[in-house]
């Protein structure tokens, strides 16, 4: 059997924890001062799908909407270059009055078509959706609650599957990943919508998977290496799982990079969230979750089971 090279991952762990602390501080400050650029799903607004008879530049459409009084419209191609998706957060005062009636969305849609048809183009209104501010607020609250519930369930699972110190380390590492990902969106002011929220939840699952694999090897090695120091057990466990972690992350990142570059504007932010989150999650499974086990003074005694249990574990 080939001997695995043991790397001293914990040697720079203090510097890595310091780096994580700085990044967390920057993220929290940015979230508190700049906030997050919420998408239509969370802030409310109107989404309209229109069709043109021939390809058209999005800048031209954006300029027409601004001149008609629609502030900061989002205009993107989807599918063919004749298919346009419009997202309007702020609408003219006259149009705002129409939102009090049941015909709000059709009325806004007709105003948009009129503005875009001013130069003689034949515009086809294909679909229109309106998200009210109250619905957006409910989605924000439910999205935040969903992330908290996910972290609570993770902590319960790891506590039952492993031990409470493992659970605390896993949840703190996941919270680290979520805060840094949210901080990334705050600093870049990329739009945060439901697809990005789904990406953040996917990051939680991906990072947890990496952490569980490391923790499972740590537990196994604590039982096998009875006279080895905890730091050496963790270094050996990380070395044994290193290539599996790197290979999985690398292949996943290749797919996400292709989505980010070629996927179009509609999934650009979704891919960006996953790219950043998986990079951070891979890092945290090594230098945050594992280091936290040492800070929590994990030892073989924490994992001891009754003799009958150990005999069962040792069976082939």
Task: Describe every region a protein language model picked out.
Residues 1-316:
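A structural signal for conserved, well-ordered secondary-structure elements
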């Amino acid at each position: 059997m080939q001997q695995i090279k043991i790397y001293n991952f914990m040697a720079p762990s203090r510097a890595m924890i310091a780096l994580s602390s700085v990044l967390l501080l920057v993220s929290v400050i940015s979230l508190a001062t700049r906030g997050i650029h919420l998408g239509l799903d969370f802030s409310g607004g109107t989404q309209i799908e229109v069709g043109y008879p021939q390809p058209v530049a999005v800048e031209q459409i954006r300029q027409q909407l601004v001149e008609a009084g629609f502030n900061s419209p989002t205009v993107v191609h989807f599918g063919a270059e004749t298919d346009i998706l419009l997202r309007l957060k702020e609408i003219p005062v006259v149009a705002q009055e129409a939102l009090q009636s049941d015909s709000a969305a059709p009325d806004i849609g007709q105003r948009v078509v009129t503005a875009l048809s001013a130069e003689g183009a034949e515009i086809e209104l294909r679909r229109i959706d309106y998200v009210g501010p109250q619905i957006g607020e409910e989605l924000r609250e439910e999205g935040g609650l969903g992330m908290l519930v996910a972290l609570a369930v993770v902590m319960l699972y790891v506590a039952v599957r492993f031990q409470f110190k493992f659970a605390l380390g896993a949840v703190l590492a996941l919270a680290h990943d979520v805060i840094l990902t949210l901080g990334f969106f705050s600093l870049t002011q990329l739009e945060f919508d439901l697809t990005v929220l789904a990406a953040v939840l996917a990051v939680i699952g991906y990072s947890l998977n990496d952490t569980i694999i490391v923790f499972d090897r740590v537990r196994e090695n604590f039982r096998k290496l009875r006279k080895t120091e905890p730091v050496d057990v963790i270094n050996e466990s990380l070395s044994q799982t290193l290539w599996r972690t790197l290979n999985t992350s690398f292949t996943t990142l290749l797919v996400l990079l292709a989505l980010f570059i070629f996927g179009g504007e509609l999934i650009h932010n979704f891919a960006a969230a996953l790219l950043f989150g998986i990079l951070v999650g891979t890092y945290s499974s090594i230098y945050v979750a594992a280091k936290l086990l040492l800070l929590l003074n994990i030892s073989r005694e924490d994992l001891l089971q009754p003799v009958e249990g150990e005999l069962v574990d040792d069976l082939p």
